[in-house]
């Protein structure tokens, strides 16, 4: 990963963008996509795409990451100035206590920490039972409710995790918040950049959706706007290699993920064979992936009259927490694969994929 790409991801991952609050990510994406696109389109939920126009009868290829990251929303302020909150996206209670967060206010970001009880004050029963998220609060250092309001806190504000973008001792691994799914946002930008000035056999829509983490909502509206012939979702999925078991799905550094099954999608046969053939032909490392989660492909593939879809992913350790790790070789494989796939999608190829059900 070159320094320019690394800088792109440092900016993307550090921007705040909980579901329904993707505006800062969207503004940056529009700025970057506009450098390489013929024009920019946006739906009324906020999903945004750079468009490379092909011939009038050319197939429409949709490529999308999602802008939102798992986060929280302020729901109320207690009399002593602590904040009650609601999760946005899937969080496990055991990864939350004592984690740093930022509340995005009109006065700028306000630092806070999810409150925890020191072990000295816990009863035996409390020690052995995980705390429910509904009982957690965020401490911003306010003296009381009035002080919190003075600081700028209001119900409805977004809260995001805090984790600096950090190249690790093994420089092929990078630690940050929000790899799920600023990976897909950055790859959409880099796709248009790599194809800038090159003739395409299709009309390409590359960008990112909103509100994926709360039900794939942006994918549904974006697919109705674009009406694609094929869809490539770009998403980060959970690595499961921490135990050292090489048979588990999701191994860092072993190539891009080909998601063949999850709870929202059974991969289209024609797309599966198309991706596998291209990966084998060009010797691009890949790994099969089965997931209990879902991606934007879950909504897009059942939109309109049906859209053959594939997920070109990478795995990330510890997703849906403050601190997540990716391997840059996996990103390189995903990028190479996506470029090969998109440039191969002429009308004849797309028609053949559609017929291979």
Curated annotation (Swiss-Prot):
Residues engaged in binding a divalent metal cation 2: 180, 213, 320
Residues annotated as catalytic: 212 (proton acceptor)
UniProt feature coiled coil, ranges: none
Note describing how the cofactor binds: Binds 2 divalent metal cations per subunit.
UniProt-listed SUPFAM superfamilies: Aminopeptidase/glucanase lid domain, Zn-dependent exopeptidases
Positions that bind a divalent metal cation 1: 66, 180, 235
UniProt name for this protein: Putative aminopeptidase YtoP
Organism name: Bacillus subtilis (strain 168)
